[in-house]
């Protein structure tokens, strides 16, 4: 990444202003930040913006989505180039940089820096809320929220008041369990089942109003979090409004799937049913600006695969500039491979969770299942949600019953092995270790009951998940997982590597202290990030020297996480001489590296400009392009209120 001084930034902004041929950008109010991007006429598709917020010294950038309306096409320049405008109203306090990039055909971000239009850093006067940059699979932590039990009030407004708590916890996506009115006919419990929807176009009055939902989503977006709605497509409540208004959406003989006495099966052989369901899902994108769906029971044989392909395509294309992501309740790698190519972004690592329960006292079996989870990636081209509990699991059993003393170590496992970890409604506080939440009745969480060991562990894990490149998975499965020889079947050890960072995870899954030697490590200085015996300290960065064959001692159910190497985002791509900026001096330093043929991993992070995995003459050309791009006159305009 290139860094520009405040003076040079100002001069470049001034130069951009002079070259904006037709449009005279103006600030409409003192609370507005406008960004203009001029795209070459040959470029097709819609541009996207990545916003990077740094800390006070301008390092450790955190990506975030642009927290304002989608880009607006303003028109063409005399040369035929296209002008796009973004507007943001909010507050900004930290140094902020902007990267423009283009979606590739799959809709995911093109992560190659050589394809970014421009990067600039400036001391703006407003804050852009923290979060991750655009949609990156598995870089997210998801939180399943049951409104009835999340707060004592059981409302959207009360949940909104706790959004800062979720943000501080490190949550990226909030999955709201079904918000619709629940069926009355055949009702289960005092509340009825959330998965027996009575009206797809209404908000349960117990939770609040449509305005309350809009306010919740807006407040979440302001904090850099996304909101998913839980969606039941297979069936409706027996007293759903469609029963009287659209009886033709159902089977000719009303049937209850799986013996559920409170719902009727929909008939997806009918075009009208499919169109109505898609319209209902689009409704909430329109009305509440939601960001996606967790779809219930997608493995149902009564819903054709073609419907999911059709629906997901329609949802993702519905609102230009809006990213919609989809989680399907099914294990597509093992159980429902027919759904793999429908457009899902995530599935459930369902078999993995079941295997952890079945092997809670069998460390060798856990290792086998971990290998299977990583191996499943050969057969699946979407990302996976990894979890220990959810509404189905916790309704029937506590985490201690399911996992015993390994509930803590398995929590570390779900955050560090692979995929997007899920936290369910108070799980982070340890509340679910010994308690079950009944989603058919009110059983509000007591937030004063906290297991500090679990809470400190989860907070450390969410922070590490977002900051350690080795723990970030992407669509190309770039993170390498290597299982190590521990000399003791109770101790599981593995490393993950990506870019310039390596993480080492140690888990004692046995019932007694383990003293053993782990081989195959990269010798040198590591940082001890998470230590069960010092978990009150939370996430640390204690320097520790490890040898290639290192002795470790862990208590029963214990865990340690180490890492080495700087995050890739701290490596200042192109800043080869490490002076904090990109200049001609970096070109000289790059040539010196090529001449001496002396390359280490930290150099790769700074000097592999063209991202081909090595330092070569091609990087010289790419660096020259970077240097020249800092002086192009028609790239971007930014104005400061």
Predicted regions and their residues:
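Sec-dependent, cleavable N-terminal signal peptides
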Residues: 1-22
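Active-site-proximal helices and loops of the catalytic beta/alpha 8
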Residues: 24, 33, 96-99, 118-122, ...
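C-terminal beta-strand-rich structural cap/linker in extracellular carbohydrate-active enzymes
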Residues: 90, 543-569
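Tight coil/turn sites that cap or link beta-strands
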Residues: 124, 524, 555-559
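Substrate-binding/active-site clefts of carbohydrate-active enzymes
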Residues: 133-157, 161-289, 303, 310-319, ...
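Asparagine-centered strand-capping/turn motif at beta-strand->loop junctions
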Residues: 506-510
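Cellulosome-associated attachment modules in secreted, modular CAZymes
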Residues: 567-641
């Amino acid at each position: 990444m290139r860094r520009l001084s405040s003076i040079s930034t100002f001069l470049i902004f001034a130069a951009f202003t002079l070259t904006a041929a037709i449009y005279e950008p103006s600030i409409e109010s003192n609370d507005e930040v406008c960004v203009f991007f001029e795209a070459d006429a040959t470029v097709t598709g819609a541009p996207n913006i990545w916003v990077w917020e740094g800390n006070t010294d301008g390092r450790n950038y955190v990506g975030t989505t642009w927290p304002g309306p989608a880009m607006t096409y303003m028109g063409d320049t005399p040369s035929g180039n296209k002008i796009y405008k973004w507007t943001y109203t909010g507050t900004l306090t930290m140094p902020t940089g902007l990267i423009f990039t283009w979606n590739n055909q799959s809709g995911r971000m093109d992560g190659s820096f050589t394809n970014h239009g421009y990067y600039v850093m400036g001391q703006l006067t407003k804050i852009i809320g923290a979060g991750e940059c655009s949609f990156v699979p598995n870089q997210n932590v998801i939180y399943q929220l049951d409104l009835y039990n999340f707060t004592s009030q059981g409302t959207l407004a009360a949940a909104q008041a706790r959004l800062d708590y979720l943000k501080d916890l490190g949550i990226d996506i909030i999955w709201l369990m079904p918000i619709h009115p629940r069926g009355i006919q055949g009702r289960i419990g005092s509340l009825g089942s959330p998965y027996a929807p009575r009206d797809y176009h209404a908000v349960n009055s117990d939770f609040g109003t449509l305005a309350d939902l809009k306010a919740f989503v807006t407040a979440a977006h302001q904090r850099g979090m996304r909101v998913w709605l839980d969606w039941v497509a297979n069936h409706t409540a027996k007293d759903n409004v469609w029963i009287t208004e659209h009886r033709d959406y159902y089977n000719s003989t009303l049937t209850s799937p799986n013996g559920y006495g409170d719902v009727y099966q929909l008939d997806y052989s009918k075009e009208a049913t499919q169109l109505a369901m898609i319209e209902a899902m689009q409704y909430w994108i329109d009305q509440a600006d939601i960001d996606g769906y967790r779809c219930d029971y997608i493995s149902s044989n009564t819903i054709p695969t073609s419907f999911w392909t059709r629906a997901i395509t329609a949802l993702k294309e519905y609102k230009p500039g809006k990213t919609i992501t989809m989680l399907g309740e099914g294990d597509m790698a093992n159980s429902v491979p027919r759904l793999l190519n429908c457009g899902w972004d995530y599935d459930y690592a369902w078999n993995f969770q079941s295997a952890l329960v079945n092997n809670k006292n069998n460390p060798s079996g856990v290792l086998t299942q971990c290998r299977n989870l990583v191996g499943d990636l050969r057969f699946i081209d979407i990302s996976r949600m990894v979890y220990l509990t959810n509404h189905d699991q916790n309704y029937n059993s506590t985490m201690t019953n399911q996992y015993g003393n390994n509930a803590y170590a398995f929590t570390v496992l779900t955050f560090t092995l692979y995929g997007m970890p899920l936290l369910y409604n108070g799980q982070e506080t340890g509340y679910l270790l010994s308690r079950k939440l009944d989603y058919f009745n009110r059983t509000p969480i007591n937030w004063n009951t906290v297991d500090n060991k679990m809470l400190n562990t989860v907070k450390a894990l969410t922070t590490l998940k977002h900051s350690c490149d080795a723990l970030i998975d992407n669509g190309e499965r770039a993170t390498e997982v290597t299982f190590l020889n521990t000399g003791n079947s109770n101790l599981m050890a593995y490393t993950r590597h990506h870019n310039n960072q390596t993480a080492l995870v140690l888990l004692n899954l046995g019932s007694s202290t383990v003293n053993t030697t782990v081989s195959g490590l990269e010798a040198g200085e590591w940082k001890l990030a998470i230590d069960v015996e010092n978990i009150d300290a939370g996430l640390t960065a204690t320097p520790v020297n490890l040898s290639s064959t290192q002795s470790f001692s862990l208590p029963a159910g214990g865990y340690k996480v180490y890492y080495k190497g700087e995050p890739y985002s701290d490596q200042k791509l192109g800043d080869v001489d490490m002076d904090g900026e990109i200049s001609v001096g970096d070109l000289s330093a790059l040539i010196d590296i090529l001449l001496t043929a002396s390359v280490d991993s930290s150099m790769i992070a700074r000097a592999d400009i063209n991202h081909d995995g090595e330092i070569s003459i091609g990087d010289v050309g790419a660096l020259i392009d970077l240097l020249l791009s800092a002086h192009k006159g028609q790239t971007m305009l930014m104005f400061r209120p």
